[in-house]
């Protein structure tokens, strides 16, 4: 569903082409769908599979015909009823009913020893009964909408089982969920489409939307508060009658008003009274990890002693190559740390927002045979420094405190300003296929990130010159 004003703009500007980012997302979705379809069982003596093709109407009719014929597995299904339609990656028969199948590039479930979630290997979908797996479901609204609409389409033919199948970044596991859990949210989302807004409001997705060039001038003419506080972040001020950035400034509400003024004046960062430089050490390294979706970490980049050291694999993740690469990185890091301590010197490894690194340190250790206590000892030690926590304590900014926001203020510049996390996902796919230019771009991007971390801490240690007080 997403931004409802996009539907208005789509009618106004039907010829505006899709952005590169949206085309890349579509390519990734197609690749995910193809990967799952290749795993699903083929037709056999007692199992019939049909792969639908053709235009939208042809697939809608073929979906109904295949269900009427009792086909066990139907891929590329489509329903259209009552003003809505839904594209499904498949339908799988269960007794006299069907389950809608969706393939998502989200992480749809997380391992949890205290939870259970029914699931089945993807290649056994439609052939084996689900088993309780130690996972906890993760909710993503758009996935829930598709499952609910798929269930409603099945209800029109009295073939709804009440359950659906979702396959996420782990393409080899299909999880079974209760589709009724998504009905209420989907009904609310559909209801909002009956009363479309007459003006835009900035949300996170605007950055990659093809209609932003038309919405931005409208928002600027209105001085809309969402320019500064996108999405629901400005709701509490709207409820107080404050709808513009200038109105928030004049309200004199302390930090929010000061940051609104900084936004209006183009000031990216202000120094808090609690400013303090980060911990420093005799031996220092900066670390940044790159992962591909939820499949694994393929690059551990390190800046040490004025040089960049990438520990990288371009092979598919989850196998020996990823394990060998992580072992090489972990051995290098622990040996450097141990040697430093043996000399009686201090050691510090820095990263910017450690959540991702901590996750993949733990996950890699679990999958590739490194003792968890080694990882936990490092993560919880003073030698592992999350620079973002120092930045958060020391600064406030109207655009947040991401690495891409803070590092330029500290004097750092990336080789490619517009190469971001989504671009890296696209480049990773090309790199695995052997594209040397994509590999070089990923290494350059990662090198820029570790250098940015280094630059920020050096700048903070010098007192963050040039930054005004909050």
Residue ranges of predicted features:
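Short linear loop/turn motifs
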Residues: 54-58, 250-255, 417-430
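Metal-dependent catalytic core segments for phosphate chemistry
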Residues: 281, 289-328
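Acidic, Mg2+-coordinating catalytic module of metal-dependent nucleases/exonucleases
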Residues: 149-156, 160-222, 406-470
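Structured nucleic-acid-interacting core domains from mobile-element enzymes and related host factors
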Residues: 62-72, 274-285
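Metal-dependent nuclease catalytic cores that hydrolyze phosphodiester bonds in DNA/RNA
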Residues: 1-97, 107, 431
């Amino acid at each position: 569903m997403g931004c409802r004003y996009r539907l208005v703009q789509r009618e106004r500007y039907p010829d505006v082409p899709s952005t590169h980012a949206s085309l890349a997302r579509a390519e990734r979705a197609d690749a995910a769908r193809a990967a799952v379809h290749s795993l699903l069982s083929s037709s056999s003596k007692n199992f019939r599979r049909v792969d639908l093709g053709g235009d939208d109407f042809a697939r809608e009719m073929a979906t109904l015909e295949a269900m009427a014929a009792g086909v066990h597995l139907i891929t590329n299904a489509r329903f259209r009823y009552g003003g809505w339609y839904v594209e499904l990656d498949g339908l799988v028969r269960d007794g006299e009913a069907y389950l809608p199948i969706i393939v998502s590039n989200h992480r749809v479930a997380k391992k949890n020893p205290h939870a259970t979630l029914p699931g089945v290997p993807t290649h056994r979908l439609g052939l084996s009964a689900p088993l309780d797996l130690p996972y906890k479901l993760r909710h993503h609204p758009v996935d829930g909408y598709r499952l609910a609409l798929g269930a409603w389409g099945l209800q029109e033919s009295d073939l709804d089982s009440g359950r659906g199948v979702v396959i996420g970044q782990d393409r080899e596991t299909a999880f079974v969920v209760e589709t009724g859990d998504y009905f209420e949210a989907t009904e609310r989302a559909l209801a909002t489409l009956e009363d479309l807004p007459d003006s835009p409001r900035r949300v996170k997705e605007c950055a990659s939307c093809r209609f932003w060039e038309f919405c931005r001038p409208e928002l600027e003419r209105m001085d809309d508060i969402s320019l500064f506080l996108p999405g629901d972040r400005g709701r509490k001020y709207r409820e107080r009658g404050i709808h513009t950035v200038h109105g928030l400034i004049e309200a004199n509400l302390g930090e929010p008003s000061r940051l609104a003024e900084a936004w209006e004046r183009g000031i990216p960062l202000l120094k808090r009274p609690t400013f303090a430089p980060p911990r420093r050490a005799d031996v220092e390294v900066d670390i940044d990890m790159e992962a591909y979706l939820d499949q694994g970490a393929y690059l551990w980049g390190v800046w040490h002693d004025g040089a960049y050291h990438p520990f990288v694999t371009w092979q598919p993740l989850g196998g020996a190559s990823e394990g060998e690469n992580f072992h090489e990185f972990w051995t290098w890091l622990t040996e450097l740390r141990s040697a430093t301590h043996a000399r009686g010197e201090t050691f510090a490894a820095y990263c910017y927002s450690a959540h991702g690194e901590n996750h993949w340190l733990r996950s890699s250790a679990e999958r590739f045979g490194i003792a968890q206590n080694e990882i936990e000892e490092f993560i919880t030690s003073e030698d592992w420094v999350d620079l973002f926590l120092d930045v958060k304590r020391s600064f406030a900014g109207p655009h947040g405190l991401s690495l891409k926001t803070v590092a330029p203020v500290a004097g750092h510049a990336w080789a490619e300003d517009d190469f971001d996390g989504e671009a890296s996902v696209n480049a990773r796919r090309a790199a695995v296929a052997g594209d040397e230019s994509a590999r070089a771009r990923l290494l350059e991007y990662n090198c820029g990130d570790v250098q940015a971390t280094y630059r920020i801490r050096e700048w903070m240690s010098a007192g963050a010159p040039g930054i005004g007080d909050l």
